[in-house]
């Protein structure tokens, strides 16, 4: 089943795609520290995080002690508080509970970063990837909590090693005549979050599909549920969360995975 497919990335590898932390291109010190912490998180803790937010996980990783250079340690002393911009509607990676506390997979990783480095985080809420990137570019934040790399974003941002792996999927309405493959969407509307790494692929491989970009994945799912789009594309981990929610569970379904590229 789809619910078993959430898998934490091997933090020791520089994998090409996946949800990552992102920093300004001119902030390599912070990036190096984050990568060092991700690489040193023990297997047991990674396993715990994965199982907390999914039905299970298959993780084969090695434990390593955190080793920071003298320069990185000095940088931490000079920057004890970091402004972290988070998408407040990006469950199960980042969302806020009824008490206003940050929750999700990425929230757990931020807590491990805090415990291992002493970093303190000032949270900045956002509702879209574009806004989060803009806050980094304008130096109003230091770190994006969860973002997918793309060629456009990599012009101004540096990405940590990915911490979550997952495929892109096609969401459709629960209907007998719903499309089962993107090829069946020619001339129809496909909703996708603005800035998604899948946008260029879809335009290249399926030029007759009418892409409708939304500010976030929730917006894309809403367009689909309301009948204003015929499909929506997102990563599997987010699709799982959406279709298990009370809002969409009786309306939407995961139809198929899209190509071999990893979303997270």
Where are these regions (language model features)?
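A ligand-binding cleft/hinge motif common to bilobed small-molecule-binding domains
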Residues: 1-15, 130-134, 146-156, 201-204, ...
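N-terminal hydrophobic or amphipathic helices and topogenic motifs
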Residues: 6-7, 11-17, 26-140, 149-158, ...
């Amino acid at each position: 089943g789809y619910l078993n497919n959430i898998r934490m990335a091997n933090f020791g590898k520089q994998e090409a795609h996946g949800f990552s932390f992102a920093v300004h291109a001119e902030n390599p010190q912070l990036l190096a520290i984050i990568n060092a912490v991700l690489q040193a998180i023990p297997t047991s803790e990674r396993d715990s995080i994965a199982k907390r937010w999914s039905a299970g996980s298959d993780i084969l990783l090695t434990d390593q002690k955190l080793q920071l250079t003298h320069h990185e340690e000095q940088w931490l002393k000079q920057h004890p508080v970091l402004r972290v911009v988070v998408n407040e509607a990006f469950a199960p990676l980042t969302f806020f509970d009824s008490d206003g506390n940050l929750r999700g997979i990425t929230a757990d990783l931020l807590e491990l970063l805090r415990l291992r480095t002493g970093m303190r985080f000032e949270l900045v809420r956002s509702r879209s990837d574009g806004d989060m990137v803009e806050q980094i570019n304008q130096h109003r934040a230091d770190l994006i909590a969860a973002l997918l790399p793309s060629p456009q974003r990599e012009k101004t941002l540096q990405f940590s090693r990915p911490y979550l792996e997952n495929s892109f999927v096609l969401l459709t309405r629960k209907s007998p005549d719903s499309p089962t493959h993107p090829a069946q969407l020619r001339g129809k509307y496909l909703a996708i979050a603005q800035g998604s790494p899948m946008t260029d692929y879809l335009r290249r491989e399926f030029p007759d599909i009418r892409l409708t970009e939304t500010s976030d994945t929730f917006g894309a799912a809403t367009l689909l549920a309301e009948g204003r789009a015929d499909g929506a594309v997102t990563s599997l981990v987010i699709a799982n969360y959406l279709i298990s929610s009370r809002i969409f569970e009786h309306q939407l379904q995961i139809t198929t995975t899209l190509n071999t590229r990893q979303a997270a």
